[in-house]
């Protein structure tokens, strides 16, 4: 099954972006896991684990009696995730190279499968979710979190914000990324043959010193090589060294706020 091209390939930039993203999204994911019932002793599979933010969160929930296995198609991401987990002292975490779409039950059943910002990049998220759910024991948990990227990112309609949004949206559209995967989760669970999921939606919002403009700037910085290759934007146009400051200047000038990704959480139990 084909997977759409990921929007960034420069590994150190991507590691930095995902770690910064975690500072914004991890509190939302933590609350989702608590609501869904992730608990001590569980064996958890993390889909598309990247540098391991979500895996480390899950490892905190399951404790030393539990186990978290993160899977990602990028060997470098797997290596970085393992390094970060080891440096943080996690002994209940392991990372493996693999594709979400090609998962098998060779290692036995899991108590839960989780994932954040993964299905939006898959050409067939229904099939991937069905296969992932097939790795979970009866009565186990399927819990995923996906964004809606199509809403307003700031209350300020400044030129830098308009240009940034245009670049990122065009890049996602070119890659055929599902920018509304979050609102599509209910239908995706249903099509995958799973019970109707519980749903929540939450976003990090802030003004002044708590404005999360750096998160949106990091997306553009990480995607810059691809945007240049596609002819969407140049390094000079993005000017990554000043982008966050320019975004914040427009927000502060109007006492506006910045809205992080609207993250939809969905969870259900496997029949």
Give the role of each language-model region.
Residues 126-141:
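A short glycine-rich, Lys/Arg-flanked "PGG" loop and its adjoining helix->strand segment in the class I
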Residues 4-7, 13-14, 25, 196-258:
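C-terminal helical/coil "lid" or tail adjacent to the Rossmann-like core of SAM-dependent
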Residues 23-42, 57:
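Conserved alpha-helix/loop element of class I SAM-dependent methyltransferases that forms part
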Residues 192-195, 263-271:
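Core SAM-dependent methyltransferase catalytic element
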Residues 111-125:
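A short SAM/SAH-binding and catalytic strip from SAM-dependent methyltransferases
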Residues 104-112:
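A short acidic, Gly/Pro-enriched loop at the edge of an enzyme's catalytic core
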Residues 45, 51-103:
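Class I SAM-dependent methyltransferase SAM/SAH-binding core
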Residues 143-210:
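Conserved catalytic/acceptor-binding region of the Class I
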């Amino acid at each position: 099954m084909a997977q759409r091209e990921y929007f960034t390939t420069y590994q150190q930039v991507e590691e930095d972006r995902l770690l910064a993203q975690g500072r914004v999204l991890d509190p939302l994911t933590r609350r989702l896991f608590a609501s869904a019932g992730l608990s001590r002793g569980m064996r958890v599979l993390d889909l598309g684990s990247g540098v391991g933010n979500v895996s480390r969160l899950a490892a905190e929930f399951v404790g030393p009696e539990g186990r978290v296995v993160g899977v990602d198609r990028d060997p470098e991401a797997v290596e970085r995730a393992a390094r970060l987990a080891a440096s943080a002292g996690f002994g209940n975490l392991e990372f493996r190279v693999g594709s979400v779409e090609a998962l098998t039950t060779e290692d036995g059943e899991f108590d839960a499968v989780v994932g954040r910002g993964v299905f939006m990049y898959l050409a067939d998220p229904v099939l991937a979710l069905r296969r992932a759910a097939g790795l979970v024991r009866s009565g186990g948990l399927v819990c995923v979190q996906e964004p809606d990227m199509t809403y307003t990112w700031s209350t300020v309609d400044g030129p830098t914000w308009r240009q940034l949004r245009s670049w990122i949206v065009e890049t996602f559209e070119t890659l055929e990324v599902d920018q509304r995967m979050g609102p599509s989760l209910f239908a995706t669970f249903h099509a995958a043959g799973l019970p109707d999921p519980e749903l929540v939606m939450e976003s990090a919002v802030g003004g002044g010193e708590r404005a999360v403009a750096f998160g949106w700037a990091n997306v553009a910085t990480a995607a810059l090589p691809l945007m240049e290759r596609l002819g969407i934007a140049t390094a000079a146009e993005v000017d990554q060294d000043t982008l966050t400051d320019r975004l914040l200047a427009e927000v502060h000038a109007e006492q506006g706020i910045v809205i992080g990704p609207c993250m939809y959480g969905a969870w259900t139990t496997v029949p």
